Amino acid sequence: MSSPRRRIETDVMKLLMSDYEVTLVNDNMQEFYVRFHGPSETPYSGGIWKVHVELPSEYPWKSPSIGFVNRIFHPNIDELSGSVCLDVINQTWSPMFDMINIFEVFLPQLLRYPNASDPLNGEAAALLLREPNTYYAKVRDYIARYANKEDADITLNDSSDDDTMSSIDTESGDEIAGPMDSDF
């Protein structure tokens, strides 16, 4: 059985060698960003997000912390912080999973099958249950405003100002969710 440090290195190296765009924070394998594309055949298709991942020292026995940096409208994701509902992560997490599973299975399934009974975003949950067409329209609006390729590229590459990640926040008056690392 390998140590947690070795497992972290192995899983992050697999992710770095995959097709995902990964950026380590200060060359630290326990904190990084991944560019994530919304799964096809879902309302999130075409969306591009920057996902912040932090691996605890107890990884893989303890689940990673996952958060969307640019905004997403989803019942199980906090709209302002971008945090993914811990219950959702912890209920499905197993030490047998690796970081590739997070981006190829876990996050696509979360977006494909939102759980309105365990919401972090009450508005999204209520709309999904009561007015699904309005919910899907709002998801598409958020993708157009916060998760298109141009904005994701700016978000992924902007290192000039800690307080802004893209020009969209100053144009719309909305804040983009999550902290921005100045080295990113």
Swiss-Prot record:
InterPro entries: UBQ-conjugat_E2_core, UBQ-conjugating_AS, UBQ-conjugating_enzyme/RWD. Pathway: Protein modification; protein ubiquitination. It is an enzyme of class 2 (transferase). The keyword Protein biosynthesis does not apply. It catalyses: S-ubiquitinyl-[E1 ubiquitin-activating enzyme]-L-cysteine + [E2 ubiquitin-conjugating enzyme]-L-cysteine = [E1 ubiquitin-activating enzyme]-L-cysteine + S-ubiquitinyl-[E2 ubiquitin-conjugating enzyme]-L-cysteine. SMART domains: UBCc. It is found in: Cytoplasm. Its EC number is 2.3.2.23. One of its GO terms (molecular function) is ubiquitin conjugating enzyme activity. Belongs to the ubiquitin-conjugating enzyme family. This is Ubiquitin-conjugating enzyme E2 8. It comes from Schizosaccharomyces pombe (strain 972 / ATCC 24843) (Fission yeast). The lineage of its organism: Eukaryota, Fungi, Dikarya, Ascomycota, Taphrinomycotina.
